[in-house]
Amino acid sequence: MTGIGNSHIAIKASPEVQAWFDQGLSLLHDFWDYESAKAFEQAVRLAPNCGMCWWGLSRAIEMREDEMSVYGKKALARAVELKSHAGAEGKLYIEAAAAAAAAKNDDRSAEIAILRTLVKKNPNDIEARIYLAGAVGNGYDDKGEPKPGQKERIAILESVIRDAPTDSAANHYWIHAMEPGNHPEAALKSAALLASLAPTSGHMVHMPGHIFYRVGNYAEAEHWFAASIEADERYMRDQHVSPDDDWNYVHNMMYAIANLMEQGKLAEANALSDHLSAARGKLSATLYIWSARDQVTRISQRLPVALRVGDWDAVLAMLSQANLGEGEKTANLRFLAAELSDYARGMKALESDDIAAVDIEAAQSASARMDAGLWRAQKAQEDKDAAKDKDKKDDAKTNDAQKDKPPMAAILPDANAEPLMKCLSIASLELRAGVLVAQGKLDEARKLYAEARVEEKKVGYHEPPFYIRPVGENEAAALLRAKDYAGAIAAYETALEERPNSGFGLYGLARVKELQGDAAGAREGYRAFLKAWPSADASLPQVAHARSVAGAEVAATR
């Protein structure tokens, strides 16, 4: 394969085996597990005693996670058996992988120690430094600042990019290292470069979109997400591969849909949602059962768009038409649909420009049903977790032959419950806070909104965000109805920190200025909104209203 990157580790093998190994390694760094495994398998066929080839195969299989874990362990065991033939550096790569596999409770200290030895032995080994960076990284704190291990990861990757500025893997990992923190703009240079280093890889072409989305350059992000769709569809068509073996395809489209929404391109977002619905696979990797956003699309493909804009009538219509069947395989999806129905009913009851006309009783009733459903689900999950713990203890007593049986991948598995409950708990807090605003209890409402924002942060960084509509926007809309203009401005600004340059937040700020009677501020705000949404759906009421207030000269530029 060509156009997949430029990674290399010198191994003790023939030139042909080396070429297959490097192909597998580049694909591994592209997160292209399916093709990476195929390349390493070919290397193993040609050189069955190549320990590093087995090492690579184990890494590729590991990336496919649980359903392939038995095979990954066998490949790693074979690498360990052959490590004495792998050379001094190859032996350390294999030992580091073995240490990682044997680690308990995410303790990577043994692996890190071996990788440090490898880097010390050969400071110019780019791959060793990249693997060390991956091992030491431990993410960001609640304020978006890097933890100590993450600081070291960043420093290592910076040094690698200084020494090898066009290394495809280093630029890929640099984007991942920087995007969750407070300074995603530090990866803009890599975002501009990466796709040219691996133009065949759908994921590598997609990655620039992560950074451009984070910095609020949604138009540029759209370009890369669209290019990734083309790359993946060309690959699947030419190689007769299904979406189940190209996980990036679904991931990229989910991100593309989220990105279109932030630009006000709702018609395109809906059209791409329809395309995605027909393109999903049948396994957990392409159904994204751990992503709350993806599970919403399994109920109804256009549901995330309706939730993003707060079109509660459309949300309720889609939920009422959902056909999720019966039985255990859709239990969590049915729970999600029921909870979203109560949430939408409550939010609809609260939505009125005249706060005195709000149907508080209906909103309270919906909130109570939602909370009762969450309580029952949490209790059921606790019971399931207890049963799983018992099963694990029983499994520990089974014989080795039983443990090594190849696992069967579930077809059309249910959604994971935990991410759903986290997001629904946030929605519950929002709904309860909205009721308090309608009752005039603003101080109590602010506390609940603050709690909801904390919980939104705790969900963690995801690509795209699991929580579809930022808490700040719902808070601002409620406070605006209560004529708490200062509170609404602060809430919209908080939302814009999460989604920079999003037209939803910018429109909200302009609307506050208008309701305050600040005509000049409103015109300026609506102009900023129209600048951010130059290609938004012309039929959107926000666009029409902004143009009417901002002036004819702004309308003429559209």
Task: For every predicted segment, state its role.
Residues 13-42, 94, 98-105, 430-431, ...:
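Alpha-helical segment of the N-proximal tetratricopeptide repeat
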Residues 22, 56, 94-99, 131, ...:
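"A position-specific structural signal for the A-helix of alpha-solenoid helical repeats
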Residues 30-31, 64, 102-105, 139, ...:
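Structural motif corresponding to the intra-repeat A-B loop/turn of tetratricopeptide repeats
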Residues 45, 80-81, 120, 162, ...:
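Amphipathic alpha-helical segments of tetratricopeptide repeats
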